[in-house]
Swiss-Prot record:
UniProt biased composition (Basic and acidic residues): 186-203, 226-247, 353-369, 414-424
Ranges in coiled-coil conformation: 185-253, 333-361
Annotated protein name in UniProt: rRNA biogenesis protein RRP36
InterPro entries membership: RRP36
Length: 477
């Protein structure tokens, strides 16, 4: 059987010689194929054909050896043994594959943990570590290296706030202070553990430099670590104090700020109280108006007004004499103009003072008349009679009568005779009253008596309205 197969293999026709391509063994980027020359192809053609025939014969012989020689020696036990061997081989392959997959999963978990830790680190810390590694590779002769600042590798100060916010959003925010304190302690412990891991990793990244550093450098590193930790704690305390200052006990309370904060140029450092003008007549702080009490409290004011009036009169007299000495009122010298201007100011002040004095005198007379009416009503009530409340017109007549009595000297309460000044004032008042009444009589009496063109009598130009209505209104024609 083997011989037949061997003869058949020998009797096969030889394959045609094909063009041989050799790939560049250098593994260049271009992956180019090099074509051999014609002389090399002719010499190698026969050798390649013989080698192919020998390889085919060897393969056929191996296949024949593997197959059983006689079919009568093949039984069920041999088949079972073959299947058992195949199953064992498959089980071994599965075990090896499972072990490999477990190791692969563990390595993937470690890579994920490492990636998460690296993601939590700030970018500045990674850049600093990279700079340190570049420095170590560039300078090999340096024996002692300064340890990097681990404070830059710490987690962001607001990471805890972000975690708390995320927990509140997820509905896991702690309600009591004990839970908050325990969570904060746990987070601090985890943060401390993470810092230690980062520190150890930095030492490993430095390589053999840590072995050369002695105990003194290690102690200095520990001191630097403790100092950085103190600084972090101080920053946290300052942040907590700022938060406490920002809080207010009440929404209407003023905002508290730190005194260490510099004052801006736009804000007033010391706010002065602004002066507010207050009129005591319209303020409730001054109480109700009491004219008698006011007159008693400020009884010195009338004397001051009289002195001021006398001073103004004397000043006006002096200015008139000076103006006459400077060539009369038509003089145009600077001194004469200044005197004339000062005289005008004094005259205006004198008129104003005299008007205020007359107004005060009128109010005093009116208050005296009203006080007299009030005392009379009080006596009437004591006698059992009804009080008498006069009209405004009656009060006006009473004031006029009191004025003439006082000017004439007959109605003076002290019984003194009127002075020459009062007599002059009385004459002026009577003259004004006479002119006023005469003008009123001229307006009421018929004027312009003459003869009419057609009639026999004269018609007055104006006449009183006797038909009715308001008697005070004039009749219009």
């Amino acid at each position: 059987m083997a011989k037949g197969s061997h003869n058949s293999s020998v009797a096969r026709p030889k394959p045609k010689a094909a063009t041989v391509f050799e790939q560049d063994s250098d593994g260049s980027d271009t992956r180019s194929l090099q074509l051999d020359s014609g002389s090399e192809l002719g010499s190698d053609m026969g050798e390649s054909a013989d080698e192919e025939e020998e390889e085919e014969e060897e393969e056929e012989e191996e296949e024949e050896e593997e197959q059983p020689k006689y079919a009568q020696f093949m039984d069920d036990s041999d088949l079972e043994d073959a299947t058992d061997d195949e199953s064992e081989d498959e089980n071994e392959d599965d075990v090896e594959h499972g072990a490999y997959s477990i190791e692969e999963a563990d390595s993937d978990d470690e890579q994920d943990d490492l990636r998460q830790q690296m993601n939590k680190l700030p970018f500045s810390a990674l850049m600093k570590a990279k700079q340190q590694m570049n420095g170590f590779s560039s300078d090999d002769d340096q024996d002692v290296f300064s340890e990097p600042d681990i404070s830059d590798l710490e987690e962001d100060e607001f990471a805890q706030d972000r975690q708390r916010l995320a927990a509140a959003k997820a509905g896991k925010r702690p309600d009591c202070k004990s839970n908050g304190s325990s969570n904060s302690s746990r987070s601090e412990e985890a943060l401390e553990q993470k810092r230690l891991e980062v520190r150890e990793r930095l030492r490993q990244l430095k390589g053999g430099s840590t072995s050369t550093v002695g105990s003194s450098s290690k102690g200095a590193a520990d001191e630097a670590w403790a100092e950085a930790r103190k600084q972090r704690e101080q920053r946290r305390k300052d942040a907590n104090q700022r938060k406490e200052l920002a809080k207010r006990s009440n929404k209407n309370a003023p905002t508290e700020i730190s005194s260490k904060r510099p004052v801006s140029r736009r804000r007033n450092v010391i706010e002065t109280a602004s002066s507010q003008v207050r009129d005591p007549r319209f303020e409730s702080l001054s109480g109700s108006v009491n004219k008698d009490l006011f007159a008693k409290s400020y009884s010195f004011l009338p004397e001051m007004f009289k002195d001021e009036l006398g001073t103004l009169k004397k000043t006006l007299t002096k200015l008139k004499k000076l103006e006459a000495a400077q060539a009369g009122p038509k003089a145009k010298s600077e001194q004469a103009l200044a005197i004339r201007e000062e005289r005008a100011k004094v005259e205006a002040a004198l008129r104003r003072a005299e008007g205020l004095a007359g107004e005060r005198e009128r109010r005093a007379r009116e208050s005296a008349v009203k006080g007299k009416i009030k005392s009379q009503n009080k006596e009437r009530v004591e006698k059992g009679l009804l009080p008498f409340y006069p009209k405004k017109s009656e009060i006006k007549q009473m004031l006029l009568k009191d004025k003439y009595d006082r000017l004439s000297g007959g109605g003076n309460q002290e019984g003194k005779r009127a002075s020459g000044q009062e007599k002059k004032q009385l004459k002026k008042a009577l003259e004004r009253r006479r002119k006023k009444n005469a003008q009123k009589e001229k307006r009421d009496m018929p004027a312009g008596i003459g003869f009419a063109r057609e009639g026999n009598g004269a018609l007055p130009k104006r006449k009183r309205n006797t038909a009715g209505g308001d008697s005070n209104k004039r009749a219009r024609f």
